[in-house]
Amino acid sequence: MAVNVTGADLVILVPMLGRWDRLPRLLHSAFAATPEAQVWLLVSEDDASGRAHLDPARINDGRVVASLVDSRAGTSGDYARKINHGAAHSDRDWIFTGAIDLCFCSDWYAQAARVQHATGALVVGTNNLCNPRTAGTYRGSAHSTHSLFARSYVNERGTADVLGRIYHEGYVHEFVDDEAVRTARYRGVYAHAEHSRVEHLHPACGKEATDPVYRQQGRRIGLGRAEFDRRKHLWGGDG
């Protein structure tokens, strides 16, 4: 399955947790690069502030879709749960696991398409211009924090142990991407598109001011690492 560079086959999933001021930048770059893509904004049902930002004049217009996510699902993984919800309720052939603090470079999807066409990969990684692990080969293997997943892969393979999901919901946030990339690599269906640039405007690389959500990262990393280590036997122990 080859990707369509206009984005007619693409849904970009964006879990929301504040930072609504960054939405115009995200949408502008997404639609400039892929004018026929859909962007799904995934908001927890109990997020009153988030629901208040859903502008009926702009949301659910066919290109931008808002979807409310059950916040009582009983798992710790807010980001993973929202991504999995978006994957389950959308219908485009290719799913991009996004975030509000991204900026899409103009040829990102064309570059990802080139790699997918050449390799037949079902999961294609991108370069976030922030984390050096995403810039190509890093200590023997490339990583991707925000990736393209073929819907067929999600439906037929899923996570390391659950069909129909992109991310394991046992992570608070960090390491969801590590598990997904390593699982796809273990299955032989991952390719890295180092020239597919989706910039992560993150404080860790000096591209954004910190805020309370970012500051929680240090506390969460140890929890994520422990969960990753507990599960890594599922993808051959890589990591």
Model-derived features with residue positions:
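Short, acidic, metal-binding catalytic loop of nucleotide-sugar glycosyltransferases
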Residues: 25-38
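Glycine-rich, basic loop-to-helix element that forms the pyrophosphate-binding segment
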Residues: 72-90
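Short beta-strand-to-loop acidic/aromatic patch adjacent to the donor-nucleotide binding site
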Residues: 92-103
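A conserved acidic beta->alpha catalytic loop
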Residues: 42-55, 102
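Conserved donor-nucleotide/metal-binding helix-loop-beta segment in metal-dependent transferases, i.e.
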Residues: 107-123
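Short beta-strand/loop segment that forms part of the nucleotide-sugar
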Residues: 37-48, 69-72
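C-terminal catalytic/acceptor-binding lobe
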Residues: 171-239
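Short beta-strand-to-loop element that shapes/binds the nucleotide-sugar donor at the catalytic cleft/hinge
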Residues: 122-141
